């Protein structure tokens, strides 16, 4: 869909198809495929969620489409161990808090990220289903095989993809972010 999405005439045709038939790319969500797997068989439950979008871009919703046709498989760690922070910097409610995402700050999250990228790579490049289309890996690139290098390359386009997770503790101890009076 890259060329259709990036072309004014292509967008016009997609809009017209929707207006006339209530069908076509305009009716699709951002992801056409979703799946859950374990990054390692020893895990009790799946910890990776995969999505596949019918467009190719570096960061979905942020950067323009590539100038070639492609798809974007993404992988999300749905059980991260890294912990971020949200800090209030002013008593003025109009001042945004300071948010530190702290992605990939634990060894486990880095290991899961590398495994997730390897699983996507294997699915896209080694399965008979996709091999017939002669796929090429654009990012991070097949030349990157070392786990830490995969994590580093992957961190260049890491985002929450709509799934920030976490809790805040109420109480009196050092782990509490608010007391009973908020």
Describe the role of every protein-language-model region:
Residues 1:
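Predominantly flavin-linked oxidoreductase catalytic cores and closely associated redox partners
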Residues 9-182:
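FAD-dependent oxidoreductase catalytic-site/capping-region signature
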């Amino acid at each position: 869909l890259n060329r259709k999405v990036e072309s004014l005439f292509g967008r016009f045709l997609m809009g017209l198809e929707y207006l006339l038939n209530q069908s076509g790319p305009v009716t699709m969500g951002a992801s056409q495929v979703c799946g859950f797997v374990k990054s390692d068989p020893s895990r009790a439950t799946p910890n990776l969620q995969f999505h596949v979008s019918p467009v190719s871009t570096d960061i979905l919703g942020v950067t323009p489409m590539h100038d070639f046709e492609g798809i974007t498989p993404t992988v999300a760690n749905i059980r991260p161990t890294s912990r971020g922070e949200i800090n209030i910097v002013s008593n003025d409610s109009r001042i945004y808090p300071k948010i530190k995402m702290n992605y990939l700050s634990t060894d486990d999250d880095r290991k899961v990220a590398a495994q997730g990228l390897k699983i996507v790579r294997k699915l896209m490049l080694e399965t008979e289903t996709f091999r017939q289309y002669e796929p090429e890996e654009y990012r991070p690139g097949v030349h990157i095989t070392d786990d830490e290098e995969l994590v580093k390359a992957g961190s260049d386009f890491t985002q929450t993809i709509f799934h920030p997770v976490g809790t805040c503790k109420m109480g009196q101890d050092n782990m509490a972010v608010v007391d009973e009076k908020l």
